[in-house]
Design a protein with these regions (language model features):
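Bacterial c-di-GMP phosphodiesterase EAL domain
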Residues: 17-144, 156-157
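Conserved glycine-bearing catalytic or ligand-binding loops at nucleotide- and phosphate-handling centers
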Residues: 1-15, 20
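Short, intrinsically disordered, charge-balanced linker/junction segments flanking boundaries
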Residues: 146, 160-166
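Flexible, glycine-biased helix-capping/connector loops in cytosolic signal-transduction modules
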Residues: 7-10, 40-42, 147
Length: 166
């Protein structure tokens, strides 16, 4: 039903065993994702950004990862769309922003050279009315100047913006 709705008006789909498997997996992941934040199953991996001129680390990108105790490592390509569709992306995104800024501040407090922390935003987060206030609050909590936070928009955000303006 959701697939037919997604495809647009006057569409229909025949229910198949493959759809049942996909639907069951999606429901399983959504329920598990609801508990993942509480159970500390989400983590950030930091990918360094290197200057091509001199080889210095000039930044890091915070990459969200999910290690489920039974399912193992769940791909972001699989769980991010579920988080977006279910509304879980907002608390998860807040956790990512908060954790990444705290980590950067901790590195800077250890006398590491200042650098930029890049955090990806989904279309859902980008459209959320309270995003500017949330970012300001998190930066203030971490005592981190705003020039050290880089918000990256995914391709999905650009596609959504294109649809809005067409």
């Amino acid at each position: 039903m959701y697939r037919a709705k997604h495809d647009g008006r006057n569409c229909f789909r025949f229910f198949t065993a493959e759809m049942q498997i996909h639907s069951s997996r999606r429901l399983q992941l959504e329920n598990a994702l609801r508990r993942a934040l509480e159970r500390d199953q989400l983590s950030l991996h930091y990918q360094p950004q290197i200057s091509l001129q001199d080889g210095r680390i000039i930044g890091a990108e915070a990459l969200l990862r999910w290690q489920h105790p039974e399912l193992g490592m769940v791909s972001p390509a699989e769980f991010i769309p579920i988080a977006e569709d279910s509304g879980l992306i907002l608390p998860i995104g807040e956790w990512v922003l908060r954790t990444a800024t705290q980590q950067l501040k901790a590195w800077m407090d250890q006398d590491m050279e200042p650098m930029v922390m890049a955090v990806n935003l989904s279309a859902v987060q980008f459209r959320h009315a309270h995003l500017p206030d949330l970012v300001t609050q998190i930066l203030e909590e971490a005592k981190l100047p705003p020039q050290y936070l880089e918000l990256e928009l995914t391709e999905g955000v650009a596609m959504d913006m294109t649809k809005l303006h067409c």
